[in-house]
């Protein structure tokens, strides 16, 4: 017996056609945000058609960033969009890959759970996909059952890899009933400049391919660089057999935070609510309108250098970039991100050329030796000149290495980059040694997920957080070597936050009388930032960059540092302005 449609959890599937990178994830996130502000409890899920179990071991140039959830899952970057737009933490089950599905099915076959059946894509693979989709409708940790589950199906209709997921979605509709399932298809409407025409044929073919596997979309998102005229929307509705109210024009928006308003203007949320018989309230735009005003009407602009090794693909640092921008929103400031390849900062002259006109330096996470000396060089340059610095994960480790070299440990390094270094100020975590030695799987074995930390009460980070008890998400195998803490402290660097047992260094900083703002964290705070609730560390960092730009913290004139020479302690002094209270801004 099926549940009554007013009490059942509704499922909304988002597919894509014609081309990839049309913005399915942002469309799904924006619709989720719209339904949330209408008073509905929404959760989201991404189905990825690749055979990797998760993106944790994938090349950032191919996949982009790895988004880590509170429970320690390494997931697709779209899950980050979901969390930021819904303003809700999602579980690891919000990302399903073909690799996970096949691994589970094969493990069941080996255990004999299929009782001798011939294991096939249909029904065994599709049944496992359905199980994972339907599991998202279970109550969350607080006992709240979602009103709507939005599931984004990765890939493009017609891809071989996506077929099992589309078939599973079709079967979910058959199982739950048409009144409880909604299909939203995102398609490209290209503009041909020579003829001055918008072309609907690609969308017609894409919908035909979808219908050939048994799925008729309830609504179409038409992606274009301009508004699709009403006449063309009527034509598409007729040829694709879709209600005219379900044909949605979504021209390119100036900001991703404008997309919910675009969908609302086209009344997509109202159409979904009517079609699924959902309870609702009117949209309260107060908070989102304030965000959009901050996005489009900044009072000032600051330039932040993001010094990384994957800067050719900005998606590799997607959450970092969004957290920086959100930190700017708090101050009504626009953050211009300068993408700086770390290789170019190994020398003082290279660092000066890359960082000479920025107001802050951010060192993001990463792996491998390439570009490390450039990150350390960028920190040395910034520290000598009073530039604010924020280091994330590997960024903290680079701050520690630079500090160690400045007090005489000239060969200080990380065991990751130089296993034979005489001064491994960054060491392999004890439970990771077997993995680093190649004796265990790399995937899913790092220190992952949310862990607590205790901050020193009078520290810069405690001032930023406005508390001494924090919890952040992590993804690392290496830690500060406690045997070197006392020596490193001679540089002035302070270990201002640790794990509750005091063993693992979680935060480092220079006191305000040594440098206006140099903060490093072993965590990935960018993963918890929201556009309407920016992360306190990013708020404080952008605030320090604004002060630097305003001339409140003047650069220190120092003699030229010889090339390839570690930064000395004499280059640290001369700046003594305390960090302004971040809460007083914005």
Curated annotation (Swiss-Prot):
GO annotation, biological process: 'de novo' CTP biosynthetic process; pyrimidine nucleobase biosynthetic process
Segments for region (Amidoligase domain): 1-278
Binding-site positions, CTP: 20, 159-161, 199-204, 235
Other remarks in the entry: CTPSs have evolved a hybrid strategy for distinguishing between UTP and CTP. The overlapping regions of the product feedback inhibitory and substrate sites recognize a common feature in both compounds, the triphosphate moiety. To differentiate isosteric substrate and product pyrimidine rings, an additional pocket far from the expected kinase/ligase catalytic site, specifically recognizes the cytosine and ribose portions of the product inhibitor.
Record-annotated active site: 393 (nucleophile), 524, 526
GO CC annotation terms, alphabetical: cytosol
Subunit (UniProt): Homotetramer.
Name under which the protein is recorded: CTP synthase
Keyword Signal carried by entry: no
Pfam families to which the protein is assigned, alphabetical: CTP_synth_N, GATase
UniProt source species: Mycobacterium tuberculosis (strain CDC 1551 / Oshkosh)
Gene: pyrG
Pathway note: Pyrimidine metabolism; CTP biosynthesis via de novo pathway; CTP from UDP: step 2/2
Keyword annotations of the record: ATP-binding, Glutamine amidotransferase, Ligase, Magnesium, Metal-binding, Nucleotide-binding, Pyrimidine biosynthesis
GO terms of molecular function: ATP binding; CTP synthase activity; glutaminase activity; identical protein binding; metal ion binding
Residues that bind ATP: 21-26, 78
Inhibition and activation profile: Allosterically activated by GTP, when glutamine is the substrate; GTP has no effect on the reaction when ammonia is the substrate. The allosteric effector GTP functions by stabilizing the protein conformation that binds the tetrahedral intermediate(s) formed during glutamine hydrolysis. Inhibited by the product CTP, via allosteric rather than competitive inhibition.
Domain Glutamine amidotransferase type-1: 303-551
Region: Disordered, residue numbers: 560-586
Function: Catalyzes the ATP-dependent amination of UTP to CTP with either L-glutamine or ammonia as the source of nitrogen. Regulates intracellular CTP levels through interactions with the four ribonucleotide triphosphates.
